[in-house]
Amino acid sequence: MSQNSNPAVVLEKVGDIAIEQRPIPTIKDPHYVKLAIKATGICGSDIHYYRSGGIGKYILKAPMVLGHESSGQVVEVGDAVTRVKVGDRVAIEPGVPSRYSDETKEGSYNLCPHMAFAATPPIDGTLVKYYLSPEDFLVKLPEGVSYEEGACVEPLSVGVHSNKLAGVRFGTKVVVFGAGPVGLLTGAVARAFGATDVIFVDVFDNKLQRAKDFGATNTFNSSQFSTDKAQDLADGVQKLLGGNHADVVFECSGADVCIDAAVKTTKVGGTMVQVGMGKNYTNFPIAEVSGKEMKLIGCFRYSFGDYRDAVNLVATGKVNVKPLITHKFKFEDAAKAYDYNIAHGGEVVKTIIFGPE
C-alpha cells in the first residue's frame, strides 16, 4: 500500500466492517509520536461492538476504527519527544487519561473519567496504518520480542495489574475461572510472581489443555455445572487443592456460576479479584464474603508500570505469550478475522491482524 495512504478497519455499523481511507494523522502536540502499526490483536470488546454496537454506556453512534491491542514502529516524533526515536519498535498503551483528573493525580489513571481509550466510542482505534500516541504511553520492545508478542502486551498488562492488586507472591495458591486470553495470562503472571498452585477452570477442554502452556498446575472442566450448582463447582475445584480453599481467586469469565463459585473457593481472609466483565447485575453470596472477611477487589485494565512490567516478563522469558496466538490474518482480511472469531469462539484464543503492507 502507498506511503501516502492510511487504510483503516472501520466498524461502520453493527455487523458491518469495511476498510476505508482515513487522513494520515499529523503531529500537533510536541510530545506525540507517529507510529506505523504492525500487529493488532482482536479483543472481546471489539467483538461486542461488532455484534451489538455497545458495551454498557459506550454505544456506537458513528463509524469507528477498531482495535486497541497493538504494536508498531516509530516513523516520526514531535519536537519535544525524548523517550523514543524513529525506528524504535514499541508496544502501545491504548488509553490516554486526562493529565488533570483527581484519579490520574492519585496514581490510578486507569480510572480517569476522561480516559480516551482506543476503539471505545467515540474514540477511534489502532487498526490503521498510521496512529498517533503520546510518547509516555509507549514501551520499547527489546530485541527478540516480536510485533506479535508486542500486541499481546495489552491483555498481559491486565494480568499484571490483577496480580498486583491481589498481592500474589511466592507460595500463593491461585484459582483462575475462565481460560480466555486474559485468564490464561493472569495465571501465567501468577506463576511468574511465585504462585505454587494455579488451577484453571473453563468449559472448553481445548482451552484447559492450552492452559498448561500458561503455568497451570491443574485444570477443571466446569461445563456440567449450572447456575444453581456453584457449591458443587467450588467443591470440585477445592479437591484439586487437597480440599483446601485458595489464597487468591481470579474470576475472569464473568459467568454467574463462576462468580458464585469463586467466592466459595476463596479462603477465610483470602482475596478474590473480579477481572471478567459479565452482566451489569449478578447474584452472589455476600454473607459469605462478610463472614470470611475476604477481600473482593474489582480490576479495570491496567495502570502505572503495568505495561512496562508486562514487556519485561515477555523479554525475560518469564511469560511466553506465543501459545496465546492461534490465528493470523492479513490487514485486508480483517472482516473475515472478526467473523471467524465469532463462528469459532471455542477454538480461537487470540487472533492477530497484521498491519497493512
Curated annotation (Swiss-Prot):
Cofactor(s) named in the record: Zn(2+)
Record has Ion transport as a keyword: no
Entry binding sites for NAD(+): 202, 207, 275-277, 299-301
EC annotation from Swiss-Prot or TrEMBL: 1.1.1.-, 1.1.1.9
GO function term, MF aspect, one: L-iditol 2-dehydrogenase (NAD+) activity
Keyword terms of this UniProt record: Metal-binding, NAD, Oxidoreductase, Zinc
Record family assignment: Belongs to the zinc-containing alcohol dehydrogenase family.
Subunit structure: Homotetramer.
The protein's name: Sorbitol dehydrogenase 2
Protein source organism: Saccharomyces cerevisiae (strain ATCC 204508 / S288c)
High-level lineage: Eukaryota, Fungi, Dikarya, Ascomycota, Saccharomycotina
